[in-house]
Amino acid sequence: MPTVVIPVKELVTICREEGVDQVFVDAAHGIGCVDVDMKQIGADFYTSNLHKWFFCPPSVAFLYCKKSTNYSDLHHPVVSHEYGNGLAIESAWIGTRDYSSYLVVPKVLEFINRFEGGIEGIKKRNHEYVVEMGQMLVKAWGTRLGCPPEMCSSMVMVGLPACLGISSDHDALELRTCLRDKFGVEVPIYYRQPKDGEEGGVVTGYARISYQVYNKVEDYYKFRDAINQLVDNAFTCASLPIS
């Protein structure tokens, strides 16, 4: 999915004003990437993954449920003898699932706090660096960012040269594969369908770049140079094999 920071708190407020009873926020990239404050957001339910920006292994996540007597009929879909003991207890044990990944969270917190400013410092630096790298790329390619820097988190959408001829979701997927196989670059590519009235030379492809503490400037130079080489070779997505 394309990346942009949306005003969740304001959207929840609008939902309340419009009479929406319950609001569920699916914030897959939230924790470790943007500020997360349940009381300020005001949603009834909020979930986020800790394996994306909080340095945890896959399957570590959390689900917040606002305390309310209205949710007494809310239950986990996979439940047995704990039925009726509350959502937290009902969700505590699901068959033979491996829960060892959750045990790393205390050590992850220790690791995060080794960095200057802890998670707040990491988020700030990630944002600053990804915007800097995004601006470097659009300057090199003569394109633009997909949204203003203030609407970026630790990720940013970077316009790709129009001459690459990205004209479908399939083209975007095949170009991503090409970058991985030929240049050792892994980056999500997204197709933006032209609006009515837009003509040739329009940016239709965007790359979603991200920045984490282990990234280096050379990673982004490698991506820049790979795209430049494709452009110099007069590459277009039409030349990619049809799979």
Regions found by a protein language model. Name each.
Residues M1-S243:
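Pyridoxal 5′-phosphate
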